[in-house]
Amino acid sequence: MWYNNILETIGNTPMVRLNKITKDIPATVLAKIETTNPGNSIKDRMALKMIEDAEKSGKLKPGGTIIEGTSGNTGMGLAIAAVIKGYKCIFTSTDKQSKEKFDALRAFGAEVIVCPTNVDPEDPRSYYSVSSRLEREVPNSWKPNQYDNLSNSQAHYEQTGPEIWEQTEGKITHLVAGVGTGGTISGIARYLKEKNPAIQVLGVDTYGSVFKKYKETGIFDKNEVYPYITEGIGEDFLPKNVDFSLIDHFEKVTDKDAALMTREIARKEGIFAGNSTGSAVAGLLQMKDRFKEGDLVVIVFPDHGSRYMGKMYNEDWLRDRGFLKDEKLTARHIIEKKENQQIVTIDCEKTVLEAINTIKSLNISQIPVTQKGMVIGKITESDILNSLIENPSIKSHPVKEIMTGPFPFVDLNTSIDKISAMINKDNIAVLIEANGQIEIITQYDVINAISA
């Protein structure tokens, strides 16, 4: 079986039981893992739906430009669809969003304009206002307006809700989801409550957002609004996609609890999820008294952790905000968590062909080069390939002729953040001398240690 294009792979995401992190909850808790969508987030669903509906209505014309205010995930969904359908994209976002999100959008050819966070939505500098101005100024442009475009929630009514109902065989008793634009929770809730009105829908909000108080009092209180760090949930206004009548309860979660829980999910469940997932799980645990044995709780995991490597998965970032005590993961921890595999080296007088055979037989991508037991350089797959292209006879030459500078050495107390920063396209590993032996740490080892 194959698909005609990447857009056809959107949806039908897996449901995974949570075990360790929910051990104090008597109910069965299932995570709806939306990171398997092509853009690694749930927003792919509604991005495609908004575009398709705009095409049908004539609002989005061939060769047009899509302009949207987005924190990254909706932009990714729109950008992927735009590539396939032949549109251009201009996105506005806030300066609190992670750099990884902006880099990902630009990778798909989108233009990204970064705006200040701490201004009112009506301020001409806000990312809402800038996107609206661009819509007026750019010819043949269309603004999806994910907050008020009801195609957003309709996507989840048509797709995500039915998937959850079928995957749980109609046994779901509670839905837990973060609330940002409101499309995800409202669309799913509408479908599920049509199937079973007794299903409880629990929204997770953040401090600095207006949702919880508005639900409980009917009052839009601007005093509730203040800057917050959590990404993907909460707002300082009321999007039309938030259907408060379908949400039975809002639970607020602090920035700190959300950030730390994001990391805990990776370490306890092996799921590399984003910041709003941390909020949702922290909210779930705060609400544990609502659940009893026999209940089946579905919690939405909206996006992937790769977009938060510079934030929630960065210990220095957490420590700078007072979220983390000074308990750094170090090179020592990485070595302890590695499989007991002895490092492979090659003497500088060995031939390039011998290096090729070693790399192939051991399925590795790099080898430290030694001379009389001392590390003096390295040889990688790309070094070999580039040399062979220039001179095919190089295979019979000694490795020292094509080796490059050695991988950098670090000590056992070097933090995982510093190691991560040192591993790049030029240095795909670092070396450690421990107990008279040389150890190698790759990006895979770093990820494995973080997730352990």
Question: How would you label these PLM feature ranges?
Answer:
Residues 1-333:
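PLP-dependent amino-acid enzyme catalytic core
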Residues 383-400, 446-452:
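A short, polar/charged loop-to-alpha-helix boundary motif
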Residues 344-363, 369-371, 388, 408-427, ...:
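The conserved cystathionine-beta-synthase
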Residues 370, 377-384, 439-446:
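Short hydrophobic beta-strand motif reused across regulatory alpha/beta modules
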Residues 59, 374, 436-437:
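Residue-level signal for well-ordered, solvent-exposed loop/turn and beta-edge residues enriched
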Residues 68-69, 92, 115, 178, ...:
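Structural motif
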Residues 246, 328-343, 396-407:
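Bateman (tandem CBS) regulatory domains
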